Amino acid sequence: MEGASDRIVLELLARRAGRDLGSEGIEIVPIGGAQAIRRFVAGLPPGTRVRGLCDENEAYLFRRVLDDVHVCRPDLEGELIRALGIERVLEIVDRAAFAKMQQQPAQRGRPLELQLHRWLRSSSVRFHRYLPQLAEALDLDAIPAPLRDVLWT
């Protein structure tokens, strides 16, 4: 995983599905960004099985080092927004704060999905607050493929 938010979301989804990753010998490790993947893998004991989850624009870094890479398009937030649907996401987020951002000239006329994506990413506090809420609201049958596959394959 690139960051702590990926870990939080994956652990939450696994827990909701009744999985105990620790007892299964699975550890979700945020590496502090895609640039660290080569160094991270080099520091592992030989034979350690590693799966990667990353954003689309950084997949090439993971694929240089790992065979088992799962790519979020364009990123984790995008996967969650699409899986939940715009209306459900709007039920979860602070509509007043989101509406304020929508009034910015750069946001006018942009698709709602892209506005939500931008709004979630524009504040680390907001990002870390809402990603777990979005994952909690997600129907387990609708887990986005990269998240499902990194946990269940």
Positions of predicted regions on the chain:
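Acidic, divalent-metal-binding catalytic cores of TOPRIM
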Residues: M1-T153
